[in-house]
A protein has these predicted regions:
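Cysteine-centric segments in proteins
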Residues: 1-81
Length: 81
């Protein structure tokens, strides 16, 4: 079931060169360890560049957004079977 969330979250990420790689995030008091990054893409909205990550743990899929202008992470969607 797909659930639109659109909530700010805290993310632990690795930064290598010009690339951010989310490792885990905190949502609703739970720490979710990212097991796989399924898809990444970026787009500009005005002068801000947004990075999107489709990630999964062992059971769920999530869509994360990173705003490079204000360094804010957002959980956009969650999907669970």
């Amino acid at each position: 079931m797909l659930e639109e969330i659109n909530e700010p979250i805290e993310v632990i990420a690795k930064f290598t060169g010009a690339q951010a790689i989310p490792v885990k995030f905190l949502w609703q008091g739970r720490e979710i360890l990212i097991k796989k990054i399924n898809l990444t893409y970026a787009r500009f909205e005005g002068r801000s560049k947004f990075y999107f990550f489709a990630v999964s743990d062992n059971a769920n899929y999530f869509k994360l957004q990173f705003n490079s202008a204000n360094l804010q992470w957002t959980l956009l969607e969650s999907y669970a079977d």
